[in-house]
Amino acid sequence: LFNEKTVKYIPIHYVLSRYPSXGLNYYQHRLAALINNQFMPYPYYAKPVAVRPHAQIPQWQFLPNIHPPTVAHHPHPRPSFIAIPPKKTQDKTVIPIINTIATAEPTLIPTTEPIVNTVVTPEASSEFITSTPETTTVQVTSPVV
């Protein structure tokens, strides 16, 4: 099925004549196209080679870039890479400068531990006396419906 079939080469002037936006040019200008455009083989072309069984695959050759494209494609940065400047406030308030290099001092958190009485009276024994808060129990009766 694939014996003796040649690979067709589309000349660049034919591609330019198909698009009326290019106009009539005396020079061989290339259109700015995407790399993955399947309809315009921009810097690569296939050599016309007869395809036979066990034949070598046609090699892709690089065309010399005599006429560079007129449109330069710049990469579009993603929103995560764009630096947004802070908003300027209308009123001129002085912002106090906070020293971020200073060491952070730990804040003391009050704990709810029982208070230990360490005062020793001569009449008392040598044991520590712990005072616990007094609790009162109140019986709550719910009305039965």
Curated annotation (Swiss-Prot):
GO terms for biological process: lactation; protein stabilization. Glycans are attached at residues 107, 112, 118, 125, 141. GO terms for cellular component: extracellular space. The modification Phosphothreonine is found at residue 121. Transmembrane segments: none annotated. The record marks 81-82 as: Cleavage. It is found in: Secreted. Kappa-casein stabilizes micelle formation, preventing casein precipitation in milk. This is Kappa-casein. The gene is CSN3.
